[in-house]
Amino acid sequence: MSPLLLDEMFSGIIAGQLRAKGHHVLAAVAGPALVGLADDQILAHATAARRALVTANVKDFIPLDARYRAASQAHAGLILVSAKTFPQDRTFTAAVISALSALLDQPSQIQPGQVLFLPRG
């Protein structure tokens, strides 16, 4: 099971529900030092903590991933949550919890440098 850091676009409720299922998940909103960090800083923090970063900010994190690759560096992994797959409606929180839980229940680990779009669970 891969440990995760949810960026500040996600509620601490999601992290709490996933922790209740036995997953190692932290939410940036729960740590005052993480709130308001620039995208490159939150990715660096997640990488230093060996946690894959979960974000819905696809347009900014794809270029950050490219910068890591160009520098021959690997982040701890990126899980991208597409608004097309997970619309921001009343089902969003439950759908993200379900999809992340299904992903984390798989025996394979998220690899350093890996980027994946979260599939709907």
Where are these regions (language model features)?
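Acidic, metal-binding active-site segment of PIN/NYN-like and related structure-specific nucleases
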Residues: D39, H45-A66
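Short hydrophobic/aromatic segments of transmembrane alpha-helices and their interfaces
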Residues: V25, L43-A44
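Acidic, PIN/NYN-like endoribonuclease modules and their adjacent C-terminal/linker elements
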Residues: M1-E8, G12-A20, L34, L43, ...
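Short, surface-exposed connector motifs at secondary-structure boundaries
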Residues: M1, H24-V25, A49
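Short, basic, glycine/proline-bearing loop/turn elements
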Residues: G22-G31
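Short, surface-exposed loop/turn motifs that are enriched in glycine and acidic residues
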Residues: G31-V35, R51
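Short beta->alpha connector loops at strand-helix junctions that form conserved
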Residues: V29, N57, S82
